[in-house]
Design a protein with these regions (language model features):
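Extracytoplasmic gate region of multi-pass secondary transporters
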Residues: 34, 216-268, 360-363
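Extracellular/periplasmic helix-loop-helix junction of adjacent transmembrane segments
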Residues: 36-68
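Helix-to-loop junctions at the C-terminal end of transmembrane segments
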Residues: 70-81, 271-283
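Cytoplasmic membrane-interface "Motif A"-like loop-to-helix N-cap segments
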Residues: 79-89, 280-292
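Helix-loop-helix hairpin linking two adjacent transmembrane segments in secondary transporters
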Residues: 147-186
Length: 407
């Protein structure tokens, strides 16, 4: 097979296709716990209150795995090559998901989700980095948005698997999909740009480099902060939509797995459209601000229009929230483009996983802190957390460099 540098760049080349399929499996496994959280924990003998409390703990452990795994896989990706991460990560999370089908206690559950998080961390960043280096800059936003748009439908598949099979079988299916992807991934080739970096004396994959320069540190932190709304929306508003529904007085039974499915179906559409929008505007930042506005509009709808509402209303508002936060690939691409090829995989892998990890270390703890205050209830805790998240994000985006024309 020819090296990627000898091929005519296209948004439909092998790297883009395999990255999209890889992200599809990644999202299936990443969101599966949120989708089957209630039935799986209930089958272990937990009460509804324990399902809520232990579900939050297990989710935090998974996100800690993503946070740590993102750092490790980013460094390995730059030092040993993208393929080492793409192969290693898929083996780890495939085996973890198969093991997840055998858990019998909450303790086992949280440890297996932690290991799965370690593996899942490497999938999107390494794939997006390969795509961003192979596809020319004029088509890069569209290509990465296609990867995310196709990949995010993995959550839709996870929901329908949950409807058709027992929760343990759903985990076995996730592991099986990973193994099938591993066989396909043999054909993936390394990025030509990255191969050029291997021959230079530039330091590759030094995670501490982000902290050795004030300018690099600023770019790195801003890259994380512009993505915060995604996991506030998915990790709090959508995943725990059944708990919010009780507070809103919704009488219909709410399936948080269905809410996640609605959200991710819309996210996949948003992720493709934002790529086209950024192409039309010739700006990633302008497209990002438009989608922030959509997110804020549906947050307002979530907290004002659902009191005494119906399940259908909640699901459609979750879809609107999903569409508004359909900027995942664009923000990951912006993060990768802030740095040279020597640090691009480290940035592209650690930044999105730092955002995912922020659910465990900042977003969920902030939400729980507000909830514990005597004069603040569950819904108000969500409102205050959302206000803080969006304020931080908008300021960060305003301070972030435009990267659309950066090679």
């Amino acid at each position: 097979m020819k090296n990627s540098s000898q091929k005519e760049p296209s948004i439909f080349n092998l790297a883009v296709v395999v990255a999209a399929l890889g992200y599809f499996v990644d999202v299936y496994d990443l969101l599966l716990f949120g989708i089957i959280r209630v039935p799986s924990l209930a089958s272990l003998g937990l009460t509804p209150d324990q399902v809520k409390a232990d579900g939050e703990i297990i989710l935090q452990w998974q996100m800690w795995g993503l946070l740590i795994g993102g750092i490790v896989s980013g460094i390995i990706g730059d030092k040993r090559g993208r393929l080492s991460v793409l192969f290693g990560s898929i083996v780890l999370y495939s085996l973890a998901n198969i093991a997840n089908g055998f858990v019998e206690t909450v303790e086992q559950y949280k440890w297996v989700r932690f290991v799965a998080g370690l593996g899942l961390a490497g999938e999107l960043g390494a794939g997006i980095t390969l795509v961003s280096e192979i596809v020319p800059k004029a088509k890069r936003g569209v290509a990465t948005s296609l990867v995310a748009g196709i990949g995010l439908t993995g959550a839709v598949l996870a929901y329908f698997m949950k409807e058709l099979f027992d929760w343990r079988t759903c985990y076995f299916i996730g592991g099986g999909l990973g193994i099938l992807l591993l066989l396909l991934r043999i054909s993936v080739f390394e990025s030509g740009l990255y191969n050029q970096v291997k021959t230079t004396s530039v330091s590759r994959g030094n995670f501490l480099s982000f902290f050795s320069s004030a300018d690099r540190f600023k770019r790195y932190i801003l890259g994380i902060l512009i993505g915060l709304p995604t996991w506030f929306v998915i990790g709090i508003l959508v995943t725990f939509s059944n708990d919010f529904a009780r507070e809103f007085g919704i009488q219909d039974k709410i399936d948080p797995g269905k809410a996640i499915m609605y959200a991710y179906a819309a996210i996949s559409i948003g992720d493709i459209l934002i790529g086209l929008l950024s192409q039309y505007l010739q700006s990633r930042r302008k497209a990002l601000f438009i989608f922030y506005g959509i997110t804020i509009a549906f947050m307002i709808a979530y907290f004002t229009m659902l009191w005494g509402g119906s399940a259908a209303q909640l699901y459609w508002i979750c879809a609107g929230l999903g569409f508004g936060t359909g900027f995942w690939a664009i923000f990951v691409t912006m993060g990768a483009e802030q740095f040279g090829t020597n640090l691009r995989a480290t940035a592209a892998t650690t930044i999105p996983n730092m955002v995912r990890g922020m659910l465990a270390i900042f977003i969920l703890p902030l939400f729980k802190w507000f909830e514990r205050q005597p004069s603040i209830g569950y819904v108000d805790a969500g409102i205050y957390t959302g206000l803080i998240i969006m304020a931080i994000t908008v300021v960060a985006a305003a301070l972030t460099r435009e990267t659309f024309h950066k090679d």
